[in-house]
Amino acid sequence: MEKEEIKTLLPHREPMLLVDRMEMDGEYCVSEYKVRGDEYFLQGHFPGMPVVPGVILCEMMGQGSSLLLRERLDGKIVPMFIGMENVRFKHPVHPGDVVQSRAKILQIRGHLIFI
């Protein structure tokens, strides 16, 4: 799935749309975003050595994970990202890097879906 189709499922738009493409791999949703280097969140973080902030990496993962729910998203429901546990950043992400996240549904409890 490419960006234009992703836009039909997610409410985010540039500059906050942080998924370039998505594909299903079995029960996993695999999403990707290529860091171009001109993103607003790199301005000042850090001059001369730009690094994607951790909170932006979390947002990338949240948006990608929301695409797992694409069959439930009908334009009327906006998925809400309510938390993450045990998040660790093992490597810095720089311009030119491709961020890839894999997600699967772990549990459904009423209106809450744990991914």
Mark where each language-model region is.
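Hydrophobic core residues within well-ordered beta-strands of beta-rich domains
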Residues: 16-18, 99, 113
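Compact, glycine-rich, soluble single-domain proteins
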Residues: 43-53, 57-66, 81
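Hydrophobic beta-strand-centered segment that forms part of the acyl-chain substrate-binding groove
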Residues: 64-106
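HotDog/MaoC-like acyl-thioester-processing domains
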Residues: 11, 26-27, 93-97, 104-115
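Short Pro/Gly-enriched beta-strand edge/turn motifs at strand-loop
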Residues: 1-6, 97-101
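A residue-level signal for conserved active-site and pocket-lining positions in enzyme catalytic cores
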Residues: 22, 61, 103
